Amino acid sequence: MLRGTFVALITPFAGEEIDEPRLRDLVDWLIANRVDGLVPCGTTGETPSLSDTEWQRVAAVVIEQAAGRVPVIVGTGTNSTMVTIQRTRVARELGATAAMVVTPYYNKPQQDGLYRHVAAIADAVDLPLVIYNVPSRTGVNLAPETARRLLDIAPVIAFKDSSGSLDQVSELVLAVGDRSSVLSGDDSLTLPIIAVGGQGVVSVLANIAPAATATMVRAALDGDLARARQLHGELFPLARALFIETNPVPVKTAAELLGLCSATVRLPLAPLAPANRERLLAALASCPHTASLLARPMGEAA
């Protein structure tokens, strides 16, 4: 089971190439700021825009740079069961702690199809799994009852829920009990999800405000509601601003403004609109946990 703050890592680019030096710097900076784990090759990492070779390289670099200091959960999910099995095997060979498997997108499988998909992966590869439910992107919702059934046949150590529904998260927490963790996939809902029984977050926000995000989550899990609410209030406007356009466009723009890496995203994603860039800059300047990093030279924040 997982507990704490796990960073949904961005993938820095230098032109058309992966910016490995910035990626390594980012890993070190996040670990120094006491996050509990790293999740490369997910939605925020622009995985659908990476070649197979690039996907493997990003996973390998993060695992190598983390060097066992924190768990590394590699995104291996695709909309092909066969390809997902292949990638999960590679993640295991690279030394990943676990694989994050998103529900298959575009295909719109039934609940039985989702069950069989995860069962096939678990049968083929001996690696703990984090199941990722994000209906807004996949077109399918993993039902809490299906999640409960998966625990009987697969080593699922956590469910990442980005349904946006506290009712569903509450049902999921009740369905899985103490057999697995439930992690928020929405930064703005992290505190409420912990309040109903969640155990942490897979966080976009933690790419740029790692220490504050991790401190908020620890406070909430430790029962320090006053501290958790204070940090939630300080971080909430920025968390919302990171979704003024499609993720990860805003968070990569924020990373550039904070001197962490280039804002470059790959097509079909486009750069942040100028008006939204100004809104994002205002949110960064207003947040006490990012304001001091603004205008640093590239790489200095790391």
Swiss-Prot record:
Its main location: cytoplasm. Pfam families: DHDPS. Pathway: Amino-acid biosynthesis; L-lysine biosynthesis via DAP pathway; (S)-tetrahydrodipicolinate from L-aspartate: step 3/4. The active site is at Y132 (proton donor/acceptor), K160 (schiff-base intermediate with substrate). It catalyses: L-aspartate 4-semialdehyde + pyruvate = (2S,4S)-4-hydroxy-2,3,4,5-tetrahydrodipicolinate + H2O + H(+). One of its GO terms (cellular component) is cytosol. GO terms for biological process: diaminopimelate biosynthetic process; lysine biosynthetic process via diaminopimelate. PROSITE patterns: DHDPS_2. The keyword Lyase applies. Catalyzes the condensation of (S)-aspartate-beta-semialdehyde [(S)-ASA] and pyruvate to 4-hydroxy-tetrahydrodipicolinate (HTPA). Homotetramer; dimer of dimers. This is 4-hydroxy-tetrahydrodipicolinate synthase. It comes from Thermomicrobium roseum (strain ATCC 27502 / DSM 5159 / P-2). The gene is dapA.
